[in-house]
């Protein structure tokens, strides 16, 4: 299983949002380059970068900073404010390995399916942020302020045959509160859709959580707050996953 240490960027600073709320920001400093370098020195191969400024306002995308982060030698998976093929091409040209597509993956499946076929399944990761409502998981939209009418399974089914290979699913109810990931959800997704590499996101608080996500069939795990709060280190996480 791949560990994706997370760096959330807001106006050049490293932050974490609690449950996606811009009025609930924890600031971890103004040196994202050093954070990325430390992840790499500890053994990380990948880094998961979210451009929160770009997500909130496409005109404020932090392209130059993301390009610099690509020069650290880490493989970069990033998103936030990606709304067009030009946005994807700009990021790929900057050295990004995989571009994350969020709300558009739910609201415009035909366009995103075309991107998957054009750029290849290994260059795009769908970000499907969900909330359980009435026993079903429904995707959230627009920075988690709206809910889609469709279900998570409906969205996944829309990409059958498109080459979709990577998707991350965040259980919004667990994001940023270190309550543990939704293991039952990831186990079901890995079982029902085995051709997709699922990334667990939201709630990871311990090495045991990483072990459980791996046992559930997740191909990757994204962790941010647990690292910044000292619950475990990147080195400990990598060793844990290697020895599991």
Swiss-Prot record:
Q: Which Enzyme Commission numbers does its entry carry?
A: 5.3.1.16
| Principal location | cytoplasm
In the record, biological process GO terms are: L-histidine biosynthetic process; L-tryptophan biosynthetic process
So which residues are the signal peptide here? none
Q: Which Pfam families does the record associate with it?
A: His_biosynth
Q: Name the reaction it catalyses.
A: 1-(5-phospho-beta-D-ribosyl)-5-[(5-phospho-beta-D-ribosylamino)methylideneamino]imidazole-4-carboxamide = 5-[(5-phospho-1-deoxy-D-ribulos-1-ylimino)methylamino]-1-(5-phospho-beta-D-ribosyl)imidazole-4-carboxamide
Subcellular location field? Cytoplasm
> Which keywords does this chain's UniProt record carry?
Amino-acid biosynthesis, Cytoplasm, Histidine biosynthesis, Isomerase
Pathway(s) per entry: Amino-acid biosynthesis; L-histidine biosynthesis; L-histidine from 5-phospho-alpha-D-ribose 1-diphosphate: step 4/9
Q: Active-site residues?
A: 8 (proton acceptor), 129 (proton donor)
A single MF term (Gene Ontology): 1-(5-phosphoribosyl)-5-[(5-phosphoribosylamino)methylideneamino]imidazole-4-carboxamide isomerase activity
Membrane-spanning regions, if any?
none
The family annotation for this protein states: Belongs to the HisA/HisF family.
User: What name does the UniProt record give this protein?
Assistant: 1-(5-phosphoribosyl)-5-[(5-phosphoribosylamino)methylideneamino] imidazole-4-carboxamide isomerase
Q: Which organism is it from?
A: Maricaulis maris (strain MCS10) (Caulobacter maris)
**Which gene name does the record give?**
hisA
């Amino acid at each position: 299983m791949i560990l994706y240490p997370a760096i959330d960027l807001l106006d050049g600073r490293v932050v974490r949002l609690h449950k996606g709320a811009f009025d609930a920001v924890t600031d971890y400093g103004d040196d994202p380059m050093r954070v990325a370098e430390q992840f790499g020195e500890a053994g990380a191969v990948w880094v998961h970068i979210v451009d929160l400024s770009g997500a909130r306002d496409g005109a404020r995308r932090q392209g130059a900073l993301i390009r610099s982060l690509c020069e650290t030698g880490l493989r970069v998976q990033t998103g936030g404010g990606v709304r067009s093929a030009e946005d994807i091409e700009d990021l790929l040209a900057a050295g990004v390995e995989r571009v994350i597509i969020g709300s558009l993956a739910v609201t415009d499946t035909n366009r995103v399916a075309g991107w998957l076929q054009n750029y290849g399944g290994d260059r795009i990761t769908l970000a499907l942020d969900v909330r359980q409502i009435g026993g079903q998981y429904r995707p959230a939209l627009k920075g988690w302020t709206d809910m889609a009418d469709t279900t998570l399974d409906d969205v996944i089914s829309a990409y059958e045959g498109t080459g979709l290979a990577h998707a991350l699913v965040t259980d919004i109810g667990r994001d940023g509160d270190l309550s543990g990931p939704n293991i039952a959800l990831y186990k079901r997704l890995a079982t029902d859709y085995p051709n997709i590499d699922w990334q667990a996101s939201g709630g990871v608080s311990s090495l045991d959580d990483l072990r459980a996500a791996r046992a559930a069939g997740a191909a990757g795990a994204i962790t941010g707050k647990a690292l910044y709060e000292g619950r475990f280190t990147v080195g400990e996480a990598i060793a844990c996953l290697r020895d599991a």
